[in-house]
Each structure stands twice: as C-alpha cells, then as structure tokens.
Design a protein with these regions (language model features):
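Metal-dependent nuclease catalytic cores that hydrolyze phosphodiester bonds in DNA/RNA
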Residues: 1-87, 93-112
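Metal-dependent nuclease catalytic regions and adjoining charged, substrate-binding loops involved
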Residues: 42, 100-102, 109-110, 118-128, ...
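A short mid-domain helix/strand-loop element embedded in enzyme catalytic domains
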Residues: 85, 90-92, 154-160
Length: 211
C-alpha cells in the first residue's frame, strides 16, 4: 500500500486541487466548460457542455486516450462559446514550481516571489508541450472542432494573482515523442527491443534485453 503523504505535502496537493476546481466552477457558471460529466443522481457519464444533462453534474475534465500509441492525457478543461475552442490547463505557481521549471529566476530575483512572478512573461516549456500533446490527442481521436489553441492559466499560490497565455497548436515540439511512441509500439508488437537511443548498436544498458 502506498504511504500516505505528510500533512504539508497533502496540504500542497489539496491547494492545487482547490485552485483547479475554482477555475473550472467559474467556467461552468459562464456556460463555457465542455468535456466529460458525471451525474450524481443517475450514475451516468455524459459528454458536452454543463447543460448536456439535467441533474447535479460533477466535472470529470477531458480524458484523452489514443489506444494505437498507448498515449493518455487528461486536460483540465475544454472551453467553448468564447470564440474558437480552447484546451484549458490550470497551474498553481509557487516557489517549488519555479525551482523546477525556471530555477534561474530564483537567482536573478534573490528568491523574491513577487519579482519572480512579475518576470514570468510566457508559459514554461513543459507546460507548452503538455497542452500540445493534449491538442494532438484530441485531433487523433477525431473530436469534432478539436481545439487549435490552448489557454494556460497560472495562479500565484501566495497572492491569487493570475496570468493567462494562449498557445497555438503546433506539432513541432512533440512530433519526436509521438514518433518514439510509434517505434516502441512496433517493437513490442514484434517482440523486439526498441533501438537504443543512447548509442548506435546498443549501450551497456541494452545487454539485459538480449539475454
């Protein structure tokens, strides 16, 4: 059984969940939230907007599983009725996020989170790749009117200030990942080890696959 997180770590998780749920609730009240819903009364799932079913609905976000490549994603939301459809990703930003995604900002601003926050002018690369993968999965799954743009919302954990960034769909930063997934699936189907990605002809770590 997995060990339960400590109080501090659990508090961090809960705060992140609260921020996500808050933004999703706001978009639901605006009539712009689309995706998968669960009806608490009839115990059934529905796809659509918040008006897709009469009854108390719980938002299940946007699960995206492309079986041929075994790639699964789970977007925070899909926005409609605001112009073109938008894939939604919500991120709570604290000093831990900065340390992981843009550690250089801590040194530049001597750990001053207010100054660091002001210096965030664009979404972090990993978050861009994340929404690009979600948009690609929606395309591969054949969703009608699949989003061609994503909106990434950052909320400062300390002050609740928010920033939003719109990211146009592009396969440039993720094409290699999808190609690698296809290569691995082919190798598994052929009962072969995939080619070594460290050295042509294999490296020391490849030995176990040939025994």
């Amino acid at each position: 059984m997995a060990e339960k997180p400590g109080l501090r770590l659990q508090s961090i998780f809960d705060e992140g969940h609260f921020i996500h749920e808050k933004w999703q609730r706001w978009f639901q009240e605006m009539g712009t939230l689309y995706g998968k819903w669960y009806c608490l009364d009839c115990d059934e799932y529905f796809w659509g907007g918040a008006d897709c079913h009469d009854g108390p609905l719980e938002y299940c976000e946007v699960p995206l599983f492309y079986e041929p490549l075994r790639i699964y994603g789970h977007a925070d939301g899909w926005l409609v009725n605001l112009g073109d459809p938008l894939m939604l990703e919500i991120k709570s930003i604290g000093i831990g996020t900065i340390r992981y995604e843009a550690n250089e900002l801590i040194g530049i601003h001597n750990g001053d989170m207010e100054k660091i926050w002001a210096d965030i002018k664009a979404p972090f690369m990993k978050h861009i790749q994340q929404v690009q993968i979600y948009m690609k999965l929606a395309e591969l799954l054949g969703f009608e009117n699949a989003p061609q743009e994503a909106v990434i919302i950052y909320e400062n954990k300390a002050t609740q200030d928010a920033k939003e960034f719109v990211v146009p769909k592009s396969d440039f930063s993720i094409a290699e990942k999808f190609e690698a997934a296809a290569m691995i699936i082919e190798a598994v189907n052929n009962n072969e080890a995939p080619p070594c990605n460290i050295r042509l002809g294999g490296c020391s770590k490849c030995g176990g696959y040939s025994e």
